Curated annotation (Swiss-Prot):
A Pfam family: DUF436
Name of the protein in question: UPF0340 protein SaurJH9_2150
Protein family per UniProt: Belongs to the UPF0340 family.
HAMAP family assigned to the protein according to its UniProt record, in alphabetical order: UPF0340 (MF_00800)
InterPro entries: Antibiotic_NAT-like, DUF436
Alphabetized SUPFAM superfamilies for the sequence: TTHA0583/YokD-like
Source lineage: Bacteria, Bacillati, Bacillota, Bacilli, Bacillales
Gene3D superfamilies: Hypothetical protein TT1679 (3.40.50.10360)
């Protein structure tokens, strides 16, 4: 997928991925192949995307988390090594192509020691196909603009975050 490679290269060039961070991926493989979200899914597309992200992880030190679909309440598949019981709650579900989505399913099958958590708060994310990842992005969510607007036929939305600016009229900010 040339557009996926171009997108990931552009994000690497702008230092979007940071060592030790978790980046959330939401993806509708149905949308990537030009179909309505949640209708057909593709494990082949999921494999391609997962493998491309794995390369980025090895190059940059970022870890990826994978959002499931609404049928599992957009639960997140992560490596157990990333699990923090103080801020995350593990749930009993295994993503499936028809209840979780192809990419979350593929990730669960190919991660070293996967678990699924109900909610996560991460500093950045990539949404391929309008899967609504915003609920898991740290406040304050900031859009990231790239020259790549689609992966396959799916619209891509990218977000990072910044600290909240709090205070009143006397407050000063960096």
């Amino acid at each position: 997928m040339k557009d996926l490679t171009m997108l990931l290269d552009e994000l690497k060039d702008m230092s979007f991925f940071n060592k030790g961070d978790i980046c959330l991926i939401g993806c509708s493989t149905s949308e990537v192949i030009g179909e309505k979200i949640g209708t057909v899914g593709s494990m082949e597309v999921a494999e391609t995307i997962f493998n491309a992200l794995d390369v980025v992880s090895k190059e940059t030190g970022v870890t990826f988390a994978f959002q499931g679909c609404e049928h599992i309440n957009r639960a997140i598949t992560i490596e157990k090594s990333q699990y923090n019981p103080l801020t995350m709650e593990e749930v009993s579900v295994v993503p499936d192509v028809h209840a979780g989505g192809s990419l979350a399913t593929y990730a669960f099958q190919h991660m070293k020691d996967p678990i699924v958590v109900e909610h996560i708060t991460v500093p950045c994310g990539i949404d391929i196909g309008q899967t609504l990842i915003g609920m898991h992005i740290k406040h304050v969510c900031v859009p990231v603009r790239t020259s790549v607007k689609q992966v396959g036929q799916a619209i891509v939305t990218i977000a990072t975050s910044r600290p909240k600016k709090i205070g009143g009229e006397r407050a000063k900010y960096k």
